[in-house]
Curated annotation (Swiss-Prot):
Disulfide bonds: 135-138
Residues annotated as transmembrane: none
GO MF terms held by the record: thioredoxin-disulfide reductase (NADPH) activity
Misc note: The active site is a redox-active disulfide bond.
Name of the protein: Thioredoxin reductase
Signal peptide region: none
Cellular component GO terms held in the UniProt record: cytoplasm
Keyword tRNA processing: no
One GO BP annotation of this record: removal of superoxide radicals
Similarity field: Belongs to the class-II pyridine nucleotide-disulfide oxidoreductase family.
Cofactor notes: Binds 1 FAD per subunit.
Keyword line: Cytoplasm, Disulfide bond, FAD, Flavoprotein, NADP, Oxidoreductase, Redox-active center
Length: 310
């Protein structure tokens, strides 16, 4: 089925839903395709303490549900589907989805976000879903009263480790450097938690486990200085080493940087293709916060409105 629209929004995180709210209120009748992970990264986040407007801690999935309801209430059509292919060579732009629909859009706002990075070692792939995860809130429950290893040193790793203490008997966080990049307040919480221990200057060499039943039994880690390998016994391994932008759909059609983030013109959400805008983590490698994503979604919507009214 072919569907035409003035504004097509790809992605349903804070950037996409904010763009939807603003374009809907401008009477542009936006269509939003919510993608493989409706709600974006916040749907796998438990406590949200830093989103303005809430005096008390709120849950990520609840916050995204509220944004989605708000977008619908002001006139956004939200489609449960995912994009397989785009053609940005000329207007109207064409977007093809997994459900077999073809959309023709006068403008597009790309809000496809970013996804978890993996270690890219064979044993990680072997045990993914059998003790290896990149989502503590999704899978932490399965490791109640067990020992867990978290890999990473940024906000994500420290937050995952802190959350996992709600379930695990012990959490070991291993980092390739001798200090964390995480916010000071998060580090303070981590160092004060008796369930958490830290191993500095180590990288994962191999995840080991059993085949019957398929499960993780430990992690071999290597000292980056001495190259000595040691074994940490555990039942689960959570990878928290950052994210990569979801831009594969647009390769060769839109300007990106060396890390495959979409390049936007300074101070705007305009991309190298006139009529195509990008907002949120897909074009932001510095801040990557829900509130900045929402703000850039608003910017994109206002810029789309001006573009269509030219």
């Amino acid at each position: 089925m072919k569907i035409t629209t003035k504004v097509l929004i790809i992605g349903s995180g804070p950037a996409g839903l904010s763009a939807a709210i603003y374009t809907a209120r401008a009477a542009l009748k936006p269509i939003l395709i919510n993608g493989m992970q409706p709600g974006g990264q916040l749907t796998i986040t438990t406590d949200v303490e830093n989103y303005p407007g809430f005096a008390e801690t709120v849950q990520g999935p609840w916050l995204m549900e509220q944004m989605s309801m708000q977008a619908k209430n002001v006139g956004t059509e939200i489609i449960s589907d995912y994009v397989e292919k785009v053609d940005l060579s000329k207007r109207p732009f064409k977007v093809f989805t997994g459900a077999g629909n073809e959309y023709e859009a006068e403008s597009i706002i790309i809000c496809t976000g970013a996804e978890a990075k993996w270690l890219s070692i064979a044993s990680e792939q072997e045990f993914r879903g059998f003790g290896v995860s990149a989502c503590a809130t999704c899978d932490g429950f399965f490791f109640k009263n067990q020992e867990i290893v978290v890999v990473g040193g940024g906000n994500s790793a420290v937050e995952e480790a802190l959350y996992l203490t709600n379930h695990a008997s012990k959490v070991t966080i291993t980092h390739r450097r001798d200090s964390f990049r995480a916010e000071k307040i998060l580090q303070d919480r981590l160092f004060k938690n008796p369930k958490i221990s830290v191993i500095w200057d180590h990288v994962v060499d191999e995840i080991v486990g059993s085949d019957k039943p398929k499960s993780v039994t430990g992690v071999k880690i290597q000292n980056v200085h001495t190259k000595e390998i040691s074994l940490v016994n555990c039942s689960g391994v959570f990878i928290a080493i950052g994210h990569a932008p979801n831009t594969g759909l647009f390769t060769g059609q839109i300007a990106m940087d060396d890390d495959n983030y979409i390049i936007t013109k300074s101070g705007t959400t305009k991309t190298s293709v006139e009529g195509v805008f990008a907002a949120g983590d897909v074009q932001d490698k510095i801040y990557r916060q829900a509130v900045t994503a929402a703000g850039s979604g608003c910017m994109a919507a206002l810029e789309v409105e001006k573009f269509l009214n030219k």
